[in-house]
C-alpha cells in the first residue's frame, strides 16, 4: 500500500497597489537595448553569472533570476532549471544573459552550442527564446559592450 500526499493550494487574485509592485516587474522589453539595461547588474562581477528574464505574452518581465554562477571563464547553465522556472511562472518567452569578466563579449564555441540547445528546448516546450545576450565591460576603456545572438542572427 502506497501513501500519496495531497496538497491543495488556493490563490487569491487582486489588483496590486503601485507601491507593492517591483519597478522591474512588468517592464516591457522591446529591443536589445532594453535587454542590455536589464542585465547591467551582472556586468562587473568577477565570475560569470548566467541570468534569465522570464516574460509574459506581452514581453513584460515576470521574473529575473540568476541561474548559474560559473568560474572566471565559463558558466554551465542548466537547461532543466531554466525551463522549470519558466513553466512555474507561466512565462511565454525568455531572454538569457551572461557576463564575460574578461571584457570581451564575443561568444565562445560553448556559448554558441548552448544557445542552439536552449532554442531547441524552448521550441519543444513552446517557450520562445528571444535572445541570449553576452555583456562585458572593457577593463581599459571602462565601456560596456554586448553581443546579441538575436541581433547577429544566431537564434
Residue ranges and their predicted role:
Residues 1-16, 25, 58, 72-155:
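Active-site-proximal loop/helix of nucleotide/amide-processing enzymes and allied scaffolds
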Residues 20, 24-85:
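Glycine-rich, small/polar surface segments that engage phosphate groups of diverse ligands
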